[in-house]
């Protein structure tokens, strides 16, 4: 029977001819599989088929395959994250100062909306003034922040010709509507209970004033020229502890000059004064403020030969102290400003001038 060469080639494809010996020592050829060859006991070659237990049980063993899960790409990340998350940027603004907030608002309309939020500026104002609480205000907090940190002081609006220099002391809170003013920080504070303001000053060098506008107050220390003469050759100076309600500079009555300072009392010490002092306390928190270290002069007034003005501020009080050279005495004046004729007191000044 004839077969085609292709069929014959298919039958022997994958096989090899291996020589084996017969019983007479001759050789004969045997076809065996080329993929697995081993010798039997007679020295002949035979095929060994290896199967797994799963194959024997009819199971198909799956091979190793590549990962087919979707891979993340850069566009995928960008599509899932939005740079314009209001909560994130509102939180970021808590760490920005006023200038940085203005720059952020100038970026585009979306950031402008975030940066102009009143709560953002309220937080920035309380943080930078270092006061723990706030009170109801009539102005926006961005305007309040600007008036507090734009370098303005009370003598920038009025009496510019008398002004020499100034120093920002900080901010504190007056919330009891009654303040205790004193020019003496030595010894224990004594609160007068009777008499007019002038009588209180003459007897103890301190007084009580009522109808204080509650809220945050800003304190500055001002250095002025002699108020008694207009001579350019006069070297006399006057020190003033100048405190104001945080919204004073935004009030129309102050800006147009209709609100003015009134002298409420004065006290003259006609002997050598070692220092010029002035302090303002919230009466309700007087005991707490006294124990905060204000009366411990050694802790904040410097060395005995240090004549530079020193100041200390507490949550509900402020005080200044300047050592003086030998002198003939000192004149202390107390001024207040009201918000209109019958309004609350919105500013207080304690001034010291050598006689």
Curated annotation (Swiss-Prot):
Residues 1-44 are annotated as: Disordered. Residues 1-14 have a biased composition (Basic and acidic residues). InterPro entries: F-box-like_dom_sf. Residues 78-124 form the F-box domain. This is Probable F-box protein At5g36000.
């Amino acid at each position: 029977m004839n077969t085609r060469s292709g069929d014959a080639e298919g039958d022997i494809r994958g096989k090899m001819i291996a020589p084996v010996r017969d019983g007479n020592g001759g050789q004969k050829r045997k076809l065996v599989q080329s993929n697995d060859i081993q010798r039997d006991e007679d020295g002949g070659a035979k095929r060994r088929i290896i199967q797994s237990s799963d194959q024997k049980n009819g199971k198909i063993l799956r091979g190793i395959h590549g990962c087919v899960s979707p891979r993340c790409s850069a566009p995928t990340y960008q599509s899932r994250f939005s740079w314009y998350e209001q909560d994130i940027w509102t939180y970021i603004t808590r760490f920005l100062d006023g200038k940085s907030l203005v720059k952020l608002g100038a970026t585009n309309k979306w950031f402008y909306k975030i940066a102009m939020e009143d709560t953002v500026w309220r937080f920035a104002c309380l943080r930078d003034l270092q006061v723990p609480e706030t009170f109801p205000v009539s102005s926006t907090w961005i305007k309040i922040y600007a008036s507090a940190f734009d370098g303005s002081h009370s003598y920038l609006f009025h009496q510019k010709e008398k002004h020499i220099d100034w120093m920002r002391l900080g901010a504190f809170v007056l919330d009891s509507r009654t303040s205790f003013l004193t020019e003496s920080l030595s010894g224990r504070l004594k609160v007068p209970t009777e008499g007019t303001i002038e009588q209180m000053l003459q007897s103890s060098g301190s007084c009580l004033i009522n109808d204080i506008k509650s809220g945050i107050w800003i304190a500055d220390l001002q250095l002025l020229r002699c108020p008694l003469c207009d001579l350019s050759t006069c070297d006399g100076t006057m020190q003033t502890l100048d405190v104001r309600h945080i919204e004073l500079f935004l009030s129309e009555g102050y800006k147009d000059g209709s609100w003015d300072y009134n002298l409420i009392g004065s006290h003259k010490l006609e002997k050598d004064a070692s220092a010029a002092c002035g302090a303002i306390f919230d009466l309700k928190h007087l005991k707490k403020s006294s124990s905060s270290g204000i009366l411990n002069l050694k802790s904040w007034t410097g060395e005995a030969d240090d004549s530079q003005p020193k100041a200390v501020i507490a949550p509900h009080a402020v005080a200044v102290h300047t050592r003086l050279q030998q002198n003939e005495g000192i004149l202390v004046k107390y001024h207040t400003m009201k918000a209109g004729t019958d309004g609350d007191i919105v500013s207080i000044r304690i001034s010291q001038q050598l006689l």
